[in-house]
């Protein structure tokens, strides 16, 4: 009983005691002893041994150790987070930020605040920049350039550092055109100017010379102007003048230019004799010809350009339509220097017919009076006739309607060899019927004497038969633009 009681008591007591003991031992002994055993764990000691000084929050090393490493600790594995102790989580959800993140070439960490070296414009993190200024000399440490996937080499700069600027992330633009440049600028415009000045300069000289050869072809050949508008000397005139004048224009429309046309309306575009005698001969060939061209545009009488004898001249030999003002064999003739309007003194005319109305526009082959003596231009022997027009017998007293030389050629200076008026003859617009040789009707339009080279046969163009139209009244006496001959009134009654 006692034993049982003891057992029961023991069991009860043991059960109760054991329960109390367990309750006491578990929280006191087990819980209290285990923390004491865990405290001397080596982890805090390892951390303390790794960083002897007070650790930075979030990093396991201080600024000096980080600077002294000079990126060598992270040189082979830069930009990888294996050796970095990040104290924040990266959430890659969201939009991509355009602001680039640069890594410091000294410590290899991302740069939040730049330390910008002036004047070389290289950047490091601001802490490394200040540490470099304190410990190192006043030279830029240079930048790191990637040799291969995991290796980098340092590009030396060695520029003296005057000051260090502090810049926030996103405020600088770094040059990445050339590897190792890494210069930073405060604006995109300055960065582009740096790229154009430093890196694109070599390509510019090759592109510049290309547009240069474009300009020379734009200028017209200088020989074109003298061929068309300036009367060259006889020798040169025979060579290059004919092809243009015989091809470009239709047969020159004959203007009914009997004596009224030559006297008054021709005076409107004819300079005074004083101008003829005073101006030197060589410039006159150019200046007066140019004046002739300009007066044609304003005159109501002459509208035919220089290339008048195109088709008609084609039937003639390709001689110069207008010989020059001065022929070598007649150097001293004074009145010949009027290349465009004045009829040469050697021209012989029949007695003037009743004046037909002046034509203000070119006419196709105006009526040519039959039997009239031809206007002799004394410019040269007539070229051989290849297609002679049918002989016609117009009534006498009419000048053959031939294009006056001032319309297409300057009159020749030398007097005709067949005996024309002397050199000091009256001006060409004065007609002396007595001095004009009268030709027979059987001579036709093919036999006027021509003694000067470059002459033009007046009868080369087939002229319609019939007398020229009669004028209703005397030609208008209203002044017309252009210089007037001072003696114009002297000869006016002759034609009225």
From Swiss-Prot:
InterPro entries: HAKAI-like_RING-HC, HAKAI/CBLL2, Znf_Hakai, Znf_RING/FYVE/PHD, Znf_RING_CS. It is found in: Nucleus speckle; Nucleus, Nucleoplasm. One of its GO terms (biological process) is positive regulation of cell migration. A zinc finger (C2H2-type) spans 173-199. Its EC number is 2.3.2.27. Residues 157-215 are annotated as: HYB domain. It holds the Pfam family zf_Hakai. Keywords: Developmental protein, Metal-binding, Nucleus, Transferase, Ubl conjugation pathway, Zinc, Zinc-finger. A zinc finger (RING-type) spans 104-144. It catalyses: S-ubiquitinyl-[E2 ubiquitin-conjugating enzyme]-L-cysteine + [acceptor protein]-L-lysine = [E2 ubiquitin-conjugating enzyme]-L-cysteine + N(6)-ubiquitinyl-[acceptor protein]-L-lysine. One of its GO terms (cellular component) is nuclear speck. It comes from the Eukaryota. Residues 35-60, 304-496 are annotated as: Disordered. Residues 350-360, 380-397, 407-430, 464-483 have a biased composition (Pro residues). GO terms for molecular function: ubiquitin protein ligase activity; ubiquitin-protein transferase activity; zinc ion binding. Residues 304-314, 434-449 have a biased composition (Polar residues). The keyword Zinc-finger applies. E3 ubiquitin-protein ligase that mediates ubiquitination of several tyrosine-phosphorylated Src substrates. Associated component of the WMM complex, a complex that mediates N6-methyladenosine (m6A) methylation of RNAs, a modification that plays a role in the efficiency of mRNA splicing and RNA processing. The HYB domain forms a phosphotyrosine-binding pocket upon dimerization, and mediates as well the recognition of its flanking acidic amino acids. This is E3 ubiquitin-protein ligase Hakai. The lineage of its organism: Eukaryota, Metazoa, Chordata, Craniata, Vertebrata.
């Amino acid at each position: 009983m006692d034993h049982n009681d003891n057992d029961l008591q023991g069991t009860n007591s043991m059960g109760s005691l054991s329960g109390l003991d367990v309750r006491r031992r578990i929280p006191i002994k087990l819980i209290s002893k285990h923390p004491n055993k865990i405290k001397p764990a080596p982890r805090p000691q390892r951390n303390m041994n790794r960083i002897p000084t007070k650790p930075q929050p979030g990093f396991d090393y201080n600024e000096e150790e980080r600077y002294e490493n000079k990126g060598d600790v992270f040189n082979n594995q830069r930009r990888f987070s294996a050796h970095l102790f990040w104290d924040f989580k990266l959430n890659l959800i969201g939009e991509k930020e355009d602001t680039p993140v640069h890594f410091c070439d000294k410590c290899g960490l991302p740069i939040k605040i730049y330390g910008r070296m002036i004047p070389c414009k290289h950047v490091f993190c601001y802490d490394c920049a200040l540490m470099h200024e304190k410990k190192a000399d006043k030279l830029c440490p240079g930048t790191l350039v990637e040799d291969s996937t995991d290796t980098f080499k340092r590009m030396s700069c060695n520029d003296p550092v005057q000051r260090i600027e502090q810049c926030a992330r996103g405020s600088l633009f770094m040059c990445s055109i050339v590897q190792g440049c890494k210069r930073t600028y405060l604006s995109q415009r300055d960065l582009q100017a740096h790229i154009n000045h430093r890196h694109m300069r070599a390509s510019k000289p090759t592109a510049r010379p290309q547009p240069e050869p474009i300009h020379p072809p734009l200028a017209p050949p200088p020989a074109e102007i003298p061929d068309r508008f300036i009367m060259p000397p006889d020798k040169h005139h025979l060579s290059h003048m004919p092809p243009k004048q015989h091809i470009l224009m239709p047969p020159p429309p004959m203007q009914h230019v009997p004596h009224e046309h030559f006297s008054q309306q021709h005076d409107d575009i004819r300079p005074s004799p004083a101008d003829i005698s005073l101006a030197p001969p060589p410039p006159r060939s150019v200046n007066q010809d140019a004046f002739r061209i300009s007066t044609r545009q304003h005159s109501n009488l002459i509208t035919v350009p220089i290339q008048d004898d195109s088709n008609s001249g084609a039937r003639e030999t390709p001689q110069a339509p207008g010989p020059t003002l001065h022929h070598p064999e007649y150097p001293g003739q004074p009145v010949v220097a009027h290349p465009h309007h004045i009829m040469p003194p050697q021209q012989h005319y029949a007695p003037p017919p009743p004046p037909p109305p002046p034509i203000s526009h070119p006419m196709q082959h105006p009526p040519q009076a039959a039997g009239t003596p031809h206007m002799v231009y004394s410019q040269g022997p007539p070229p051989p006739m290849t297609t002679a027009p049918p002989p016609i017998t117009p009534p006498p007293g009419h000048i053959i309607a031939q294009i006056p030389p001032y319309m297409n050629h300057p009159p020749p200076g030398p007097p005709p060899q067949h005996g024309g008026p002397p050199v000091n003859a009256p001006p060409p617009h004065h007609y002396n019927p007595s001095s004009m040789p009268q030709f027979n009707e059987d001579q036709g339009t093919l036999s006027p004497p021509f003694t000067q080279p470059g002459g033009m046969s007046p009868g080369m163009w087939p002229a319609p038969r019939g007398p020229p139209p009669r004028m209703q009244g005397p030609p208008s006496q209203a002044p017309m633009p252009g210089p007037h001959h001072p003696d114009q009134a002297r000869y006016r009654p002759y034609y009225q």
